[in-house]
């Protein structure tokens, strides 16, 4: 059975170092797709690079934890900025869901304005779209527009909660992350998906070159390690040997 493998690089538009790392991992490695933060400092640079790479699938990385929102969000921001206090608000069930739904629509329109096309799919920074209060908003939004959505089926949900016309991969992994990033780790993810009988799999990654913005991230130098692994010729060969076809969310 042929299996579709989507290797999606998150954080396109975060910084020029991030952008160049993603492009390097696409041109000379196994990355096939990316998702862009429309409020990122280097989003225009990302859009410029993407125009030179029309086959690179570009989706939208919905942001509720970093930087300035596109719309006014007095119920979620502090001093005009988004932040990780969203976790506490989710636990207390005090999320401003109307503001979040409006911000999603505004970020989506901003993506179209910057990239000149609709995103191939949606996911989110720090996986906030998987919060039980937020997931129905994002799932409905994606289904209405006919675009795919990253779904971590281990954290949500039974299938009855999903819109019938919502597209996603059968499998998703965030395990290629952290301090122990190796080719063996990547291949274990593929082998586990094969064992589950999944016909499509998304693997999340964050390849980057380190610049001043990336240095401010709690997840900094492992991004360079990811880039090294993802551009390994032996990894590309091992993926092909396992019967995976590289693809984007347009292939599911």
From Swiss-Prot:
GO cellular component: cytoplasm
One matching Pfam family: YdjC
One GO biological process term: chitin catabolic process
Main location: cytoplasm
Pathway this chain belongs to: Glycan degradation; chitin degradation
Keyword Methyltransferase: no
Subunit structure: Homodimer.
Physiological role: Involved in the degradation of chitin. ChbG is essential for growth on the acetylated chitooligosaccharides chitobiose and chitotriose but is dispensable for growth on cellobiose and chitosan dimer, the deacetylated form of chitobiose. Deacetylation of chitobiose-6-P and chitotriose-6-P is necessary for both the activation of the chb promoter by the regulatory protein ChbR and the hydrolysis of phosphorylated beta-glucosides by the phospho-beta-glucosidase ChbF.
Protein name per Swiss-Prot or TrEMBL: Chitooligosaccharide deacetylase
Source lineage: Bacteria, Pseudomonadati, Pseudomonadota, Gammaproteobacteria, Enterobacterales
The encoding gene: chbG
């Amino acid at each position: 059975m042929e299996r579709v493998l989507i290797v999606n690089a998150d954080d396109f538009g975060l910084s020029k170092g991030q952008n160049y790392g993603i492009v390097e991992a696409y041109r000379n490695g196994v990355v096939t797709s990316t998702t862009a933060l429309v409020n990122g400092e280097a989003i225009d640079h990302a859009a410029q690079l993407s125009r030179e790479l029309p086959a690179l699938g570009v989706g939208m990385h919905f942001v509720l934890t970093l930087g300035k929102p596109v719309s006014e969000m007095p119920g979620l921001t502090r001093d005009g900025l988004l932040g990780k206090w969203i976790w506490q608000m989710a636990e207390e069930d005090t999320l401003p869901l109307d503001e979040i739904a409006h911000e999603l629509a505004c970020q989506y329109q901003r993506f179209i304005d910057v990239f000149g096309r609709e995103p191939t799919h949606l996911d989110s920074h720090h996986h906030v779209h998987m919060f039980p209060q937020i997931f129905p908003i994002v799932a409905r939004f994606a289904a209405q527009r006919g675009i795919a959505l990253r779904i971590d089926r281990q954290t949500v949900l039974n299938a009855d909660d999903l819109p019938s016309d919502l597209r996603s991969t059968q499998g998703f992994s965030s395990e290629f992350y952290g301090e122990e990033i190796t080719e063996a780790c990547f291949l274990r993810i593929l082998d586990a998906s094969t064992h589950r009988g999944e016909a499509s799999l998304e693997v999340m990654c964050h390849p980057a070159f380190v610049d001043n913005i990336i240095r401010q991230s709690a997840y900094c130098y492992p991004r360079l390690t990811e880039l090294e692994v993802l551009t390994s010729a032996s990894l590309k060969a091992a993926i092909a040997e396992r019967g995976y076809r590289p693809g984007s969310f347009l292939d599911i």
